Curated annotation (Swiss-Prot):
Superkingdom of the source species: Bacteria
UniProt-listed InterPro entries: ATP-grasp (IPR011761), ATP_grasp_subdomain_1 (IPR013815), CarbamoylP_synth_lsu (IPR006275), CarbamoylP_synth_lsu_oligo (IPR005480), CarbamoylP_synth_lsu_oligo_sf (IPR036897), CbamoylP_synth_lsu-like_ATP-bd (IPR005479), CbamoylP_synth_lsu_CPSase_dom (IPR005483), MGS-like_dom (IPR011607)
E.C. number: 6.3.4.16, 6.3.5.5
Binding site for Mn(2+) 1: 290, 304
Binding site for Mn(2+) 3: 845, 857
Protein name: Carbamoyl phosphate synthase large chain
Taxonomic path: Bacteria, Bacillati, Actinomycetota, Actinomycetes, Mycobacteriales
Amino acid sequence: MPKRSDINHVLVIGSGPIVIGQACEFDYSGTQACRVLKEEGLRVTLINSNPATIMTDPEMADHTYVEPIEPEYIDKIFAKEIEQGHPIDAVLATLGGQTALNAAIQLDRLGILEKYGVELIGADIDAIERGEDRQKFKDIVTTIGGESARSRVCHNMEEVHETVAELGLPVVVRPSFTMGGLGSGLAYNTEDLERIAGGGLAASPEANVLIEESILGWKEFELELMRDTADNVVVICSIENVDALGVHTGDSVTVAPALTLTDREFQKMRDQGIAIIREVGVDTGGCNIQFAINPVDGRIITIEMNPRVSRSSALASKATGFPIAKMAAKLAIGYTLDEITNDITGETPAAFEPTIDYVVVKAPRFAFEKFVGADDTLTTTMKSVGEVMSLGRNYIAALNKALRSLETKQQGFWTKPDEFFAGERATDKAAVLEDLKRPTEGRLYDVELAMRLGASVEELYEASSIDPWFLAELEALVQFRQKLVDAPFLNEDLLREAKFMGLSDLQIAALRPEFAGEDGVRTLRLSLGIRPVFKTVDTCAAEFEAKTPYHYSAYELDPAAESEVAPQTEREKVLILGSGPNRIGQGIEFDYSCVHAALELSRVGYETVMVNCNPETVSTDYDTADRLYFEPLTFEDVMEVYHAEAQSGTVAGVIVQLGGQTPLGLADRLKKAGVPVIGTSPEAIDMAEDRGEFGALLNREQLPAPAFGTATSFEEARTVADEISYPVLVRPSYVLGGRGMEIVYDEASLEDYINRATELSSDHPVLVDRFLDNAIEIDVDALCDGDEVYLAGVMEHIEEAGIHSGDSACALPPMTLGAQDIEKVREATKKLALGIGVQGLMNVQYALKDDILYVIEANPRASRTVPFVSKATGVNLAKAASRIAVGATIKDLQDEGMIPTEYDGGSLPLDAPIAVKEAVLPFNRFRRPDGKTLDTLLSPEMKSTGEVMGLANNFGAAYAKAEAGAFGALPTEGTVFVTVANRDKRTLILPIQRLALMGYKILATEGTAGMLRRNGIECEVVLKASDIREGVEGKSIVDRIREGEVDLILNTPAGSAGARHDGYDIRAAAVTVGVPLITTVQGVTAAVQGIEALREGVVSVRALQELDHAVKA
């Protein structure tokens, strides 16, 4: 049936900030949807609070609202669009993850959809509830003749205990309507049950959890399906988890297609999947269904479904080349599958199920090093922060490629000594087998080590529950390793076999010391003519010719195998190196810059080539660049892509400055290997990173910087610290996201840091800087063409210096800097950019203290603030930087209208909106091994996974929006609990007085209460948790927070051990029940301004396209 004629205007709901369980795969799906709907002639309005997304670019929709994804803001958007003569007909909520689905349910329940006569498309409320509500879904599985695990939905702890009495322990706890397994877990005893089920009830928007019999150790599978209004159903992809049930699918290594199913099992699962999608009622889009199979008797159980595009959908799309989100958007507006053409072949309809003739492996990326003390056991709550995908001709080759794509310290098997990851267990088979019973991020390395120590497949299956087929594949690799080690010399056949199994030159060199590193292996390999061939992802196993060049590398045993890379055009090519897996410190913001570079350079006549391995991103969509290579971002893999491209045409250069630290780290070696690195040169990159050279530049230009020194031992570090005086900031050189960075207040802490963190310094010394207490931190993005500098954005941090810039809220334009301060910033930035030799983007961090502007650091690359600054000022910095890299000047770009001439980021027009960026932190995902929450205090070590933006005409309203978008909506009435360190008491009198005058009830601990009362502020004294521990009778503040009696917490950390412990208890309780928590003085002041704006009702919505200075597409 053709497109519906009654839908002319669609509101697409995005997924908001990047959080664990919901990452940039929804930017990818939402971007596809917006493009499709606009191509179909519909008017598109978008709401998404995340500025770091491609979908929030003004050209992606007719009206883009960067607003919190909350019913009250969506209500304002409906009203505003009617006011402007563009009433919204339908809402598409199936492409924005769980956030969008939950928003759609709230809009329905609050009567907002009915009020404006708007319908839901993609999946209606009934289908969403039938798929998401645990009991309803369980009933559907029974109706179609399927089987679920024995379970019961519980609404309170009493029902939970009754159910467990029936099922017995252990049990699985699964809350309804959450994503990434938030609030779920495995309860082995009553204590676990109380903690996990209590947290699950709090995490579920419906306040219910499913308590389910344990089916740990079963095999887990997923099917990705689509259905249209004519009842056509296609199964796009099957996915198998290498880890057994009990590890969240987002934390497991997964493979596509499923490799260990019998044909009978697959057909049975497929039949059940089709029956479920029909019974649930998803008839205009896609869904994902998870199954478990008992390895002993083949019994199949249906676990759950997502009646929407999910994280697995993005993986299935990239794995098969079948654009699920694009198809889902077309189905939502009335098309049927047989009416839609497959883009990749250009001739088959979407009703043809994809066929793949390769193996895909997805591997998760973790960040436990950022959360000291966190329990690293993998359970049903997702903890990974990113993922990679690799494609190979066989499982082991794809697995090896995936492991080196992760960019962890261990770059694949054998690249580090066994002691590096196994410690004392490196020679103890029994200890390794024992450890394998507890799933952790390094378990595949443990499996491989245990095999070398003599463990059999049976023993390993018993310990890990990993299917024997996967274990046998690893066993074959271990046997080949021995062959490689034992060979008297490395001949052509052996080297070909090693490469066929996916081993990198680095892995081979680790086993053959005569090569003295990977360069030796590379020289031999090239002399023997052993290079990869590049295969094409075509959705049809080469049955039809692919029209879109989407490639992966493979080494064949046959020397005559041919590559499938053909010249597309006569245009010069530019390779853009992506940012690899999301991790804390390097996420979607860098992908944003890579995507814009690809689109802009393609527009001005270059053939763009994207190299990346992250399946969640827009950059790895097959139609972002002219050609896509799904490859690891290592020197070896990038060089092979460069060689393949150079064989088929002229390569103008490689851009390394947009993808974060990953490609930047390759710049030097690429240049030495003869690859033209365009944009900022590798020498300039090194100069900015080298403390000696950079310090010399600062001296020449007379730019102040905090006193610093470098040290390679504790003794040296102590000498430096004594000279420049405490507190000092210590860190390894060459880091991103503040990894390994700490503020140290005394010698004992310094010694502790050196003992713990020197391992991070990777042959670079530890840096010791004077820490500027109570300074204002300033973040600057700028463009430089070698002669001229454009100041793109000046951001003032709301938190004081000492909190990582990625975790601090910031405002643009700056709120407290005067014209003189900004002029100092402009002059210093110009001197730095020209002195370093920047060609493109540069980010500088400054600290302003006592009217002196100190340079903290300069990074000659795209920063994580580029998308935020671009949205706030209307100047697309990534596009501009890509043009400068290929020779354009700032004057050229001003003449084109890409960069304004009448103002810059330091002198924005008076009517420019105020933009506030706020970080989103994942503390609700991590616990200590004893089950307690991690402390939520911010530090120089970055911990946030994502960000949101608040836009308004005044700071208070912008800050309030940013907090609401970051899941910390400020209360407009109620009870505020205040407990602050002595040093902060004087500063906080005024903001707390304003709260009291607005009618808030103030609770305070004894010391803080005395100070407040002396200043005429009425408050109630509360007991601390330590008072109760010491025998004082009554209810502690921690209990009151847990029982919902507190609406906002203001807690600045104190120095003494007892006070720190009380502070931790308070912050942990706040995280558990989701009460907004502010831990800095500046944050309190900003929050009071935000609350005032909310109470005065001055918070309105405004589309990016309406801003006078927005760059029009």
